[in-house]
């Protein structure tokens, strides 16, 4: 059997995975900033790295999986001030919501889930090491900054050079910085900020910059050199680039061996963005779709590829998952142990060992389901159920799932038909120049979570929001 190979962003290639310590894997994934509900992009990060850690454990590794929580940040402070509540009240509420969303999606809790505010001393300790090593300075405005030009390998993860970055500079000018690209390690507290947003230090009262949080938590919990660091593609630069610069300048050694990044989530082929009003929270999605369907939708795309979210694609995922459960409906699985020597299991394992290639692994499940349908073989049914379980799927009683799925499909079809009927009524109102009625129908649909977009030629498209 092939060894596990992982696409390493640092090397820009697949590499055979060899842990630093035989049989042990230490992995850190950047988690959420808890000032709002988690969105579909967060769901992808959680599902992708849940599958990664599940597969590493399946291979027999002793895994320590850390996924942090950022609970101090400018966005958090602004939201708490807007709401008139404390930082802790706000972050506790959204951490609870995060856990509810993750549990619904079948995400196994990380072994360690550190909050940034519990590691302020470690962050300050790393900043002091950077200052002692000549990589940090306190500016005239009180902020402590990282001197990017001092780190010779800056840009090695993203492939960006300092010259290219300066040529395309979009960072707001700050006369206190030695270089516009320098980034903040410790932010000086401002008089108007709430008292619960700062900590005393030798640099004055303030709070950590975002990048130093992950460096300090990773090094403290997993050691100064560990195996895997993961996160969304959007974090590759500058966040992960800055983590490398901080950590390696502080410790004098390699920070991480393998860097993994999952692809963007797109909404109807456009990048998900609040500015485009195509932004969906996990709870909005789960109000409409079964959580296992959403997990399956994410799992059957390769983690490095863009993921296009749409009602059509989710409906397709529901139908596909239904086919897998249908194969198990009338066949009782024989036994509770996976036979890894069986041909389908061997192919599944080969796919997962090829950079966690879940699309191929899922295709093996469908071939196996077809064979179960043909033979009614309890041993093959066992293989199907247990291989699905490896990636967090097919854990429910088939008839219960199928009954629920049939009901959801019927409701979805009825809703779609009702929406189309309202669109037709709106078109008729416009034709009759009753624009008040047409606007009223649009408003009613929007209140029901359906946005309309008029296209050339009199066509109207709709989507759920």
Curated annotation (Swiss-Prot):
Gene3D superfamilies: Cysteine-tRNA ligase, C-terminal anti-codon recognition domain (1.20.120.1910), HUPs (3.40.50.620). It is found in: Cytoplasm. Keywords: Aminoacyl-tRNA synthetase, ATP-binding, Cytoplasm, Ligase, Metal-binding, Nucleotide-binding, Protein biosynthesis, Zinc. One of its GO terms (molecular function) is cysteine-tRNA ligase activity. CDD domains: Anticodon_Ia_Cys (cd07963), CysRS_core (cd00672). The keyword Metal-binding applies. Its main location: cytoplasm. Its EC number is 6.1.1.16. Binds 1 zinc ion per subunit. It catalyses: tRNA(Cys) + L-cysteine + ATP = L-cysteinyl-tRNA(Cys) + AMP + diphosphate. Zn(2+) binds at residues 30, 214, 239, 243. Monomer. This is Cysteine--tRNA ligase.
């Amino acid at each position: 059997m092939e060894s596990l190979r992982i696409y390493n962003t640092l090397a820009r290639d697949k590499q055979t995975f060899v842990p630093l310590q035989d049989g042990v894997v230490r992995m850190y994934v950047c988690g959420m900033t808890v000032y709002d509900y988690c969105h579909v992009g967060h769901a992808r990060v959680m599902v992708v790295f849940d599958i990664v850690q599940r597969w590493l454990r399946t291979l027999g590794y002793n895994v320590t999986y850390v996924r942090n929580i950022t609970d101090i940040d400018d966005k958090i402070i602004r939201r708490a001030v807007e709401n008139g509540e404390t930082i802790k009240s706000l972050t506790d509420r959204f951490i609870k919501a995060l856990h509810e969303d993750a549990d619904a999606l079948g995400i196994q809790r990380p072994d360690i889930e550190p909050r940034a505010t519990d590691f302020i001393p470690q962050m300050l300790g790393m900043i002091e090491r950077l200052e002692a090593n000549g990589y940090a300075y306190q500016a005239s405005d009180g902020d402590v900054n990282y001197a990017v030009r001092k780190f010779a390998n800056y840009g090695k993860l993203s492939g960006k050079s300092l010259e290219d970055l300066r040529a395309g500079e979009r960072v707001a000018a700050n006369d206190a910085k030695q270089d516009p690209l320098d980034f903040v390690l410790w932010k000086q507290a401002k008089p108007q900020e709430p008292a619960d947003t700062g900590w005393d230090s030798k640099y004055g009262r303030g709070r950590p910059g975002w990048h130093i949080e992950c460096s300090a938590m990773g090094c403290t919990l997993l050691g100064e050199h560990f195996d895997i660091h993961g996160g969304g593609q959007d974090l590759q630069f500058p966040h992960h680039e800055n983590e490398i610069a901080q950590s390696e300048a502080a410790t004098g050694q390699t920070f991480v061996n393998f860097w993994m990044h999952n692809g963007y989530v797109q909404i109807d082929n456009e990048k998900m963005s609040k500015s485009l009003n195509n932004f969906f929270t996990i709870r909005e999605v789960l109000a409409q779709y079964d959580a296992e369907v959403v997990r399956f939708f994410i799992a059957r795309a390769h983690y490095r590829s863009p993921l296009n979210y749409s009602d059509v694609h989710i409906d397709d995922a529901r139908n596909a998952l239904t086919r897998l459960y249908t194969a198990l409906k009338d066949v009782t699985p024989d036994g509770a142990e996976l036979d890894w020597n069986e041909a389908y299991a061997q192919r599944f394992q080969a796919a997962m060992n090829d950079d966690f290639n879940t699309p191929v692994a899922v295709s093996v499940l469908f071939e196996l389901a077809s064979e179960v349908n043909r033979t009614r073989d309890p041993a093959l049914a066992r293989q199907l159920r247990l291989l699905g379980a490896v990636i967090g799927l097919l854990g429910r009683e088939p008839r219960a799932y199928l009954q629920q799925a049939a009901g959801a499909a019927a409701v979805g079809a009825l809703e779609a038909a009702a929406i189309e009927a309202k669109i037709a009524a709106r078109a008729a109102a416009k034709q009759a120049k009753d624009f008040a009625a047409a606007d009223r129908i649009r408003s009613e649909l929007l209140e029901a979570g359906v946005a309309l977009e008029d296209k050339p030629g009199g066509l109207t498209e709709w989507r759920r929001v």
